[in-house]
A protein has these predicted regions:
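Acidic, metal-coordinating helix/loop segments flanking the phosphotransfer/catalytic sites
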Residues: 36-54
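Conserved acidic carboxylate
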Residues: 13
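Non-catalytic signal-transmission and effector/linker regions of two-component phosphorelay proteins
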Residues: 1-8, 42, 106-120
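Two-component/phosphorelay signaling modules centered on CheY-like receiver
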Residues: 16-35
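Active-site residues of response regulator receiver
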Residues: 58
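The feature encodes the CheY-like receiver
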Residues: 62
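A Lys-centered signature of the CheY-like receiver
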Residues: 103
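Hydrophobic/aromatic residues positioned on beta-strands within the core alpha/beta folds
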Residues: 81-83
Length: 120
């Protein structure tokens, strides 16, 4: 099984239970969750200063889109992937080529998307 020892992750997810499940999956994959953020304003701030190898972004944070965070991460050359329960068709043109995890997902799906994201 592929794992990602020492990979530092920023998790942006507004549903507490889902965030905890994702954190567990990331830990099983030997990643370190450096920050877990639920609100867009805080995520925007954290994205500008956090030292991570990868970010996982829930597309919809309590009715607000996470795309400002994605723009900051892209400008900082930090790879990211989106997670959503709405499908990838709602992504703006600028992010259509980004990896997307469709909720609900299994650990094997997360492993595959992390590998894909880190390779790109």
């Amino acid at each position: 099984m592929t794992t990602f020892p020492g990979t530092r992750v920023l998790l942006v997810e507004d549903e507490g239970t889902i965030a905890m499940l994702i954190e567990e999956m990331l830990e099983d994959l030997e990643c370190t969750v450096v920050a877990s953020v639920a609100q867009l304003a805080k995520a925007i701030h954290v994205a500008g200063v956090v030292d991570v190898d990868l970010a996982m972004l829930d597309v919809n944070l309590a009715g607000e889109y996470v795309f400002p965070v994605a723009r900051i991460l892209r400008a900082r050359h930090i790879p990211f992937l989106f997670s959503t329960g709405y499908g990838g068709s709602g992504l703006p043109e600028a992010f259509r080529g980004c990896p997307v995890l469709h909720k609900p997902f299994a650990e094997k799906d997360l492993r595959l998307k992390i590998a894909l994201t880190l390779e790109s």
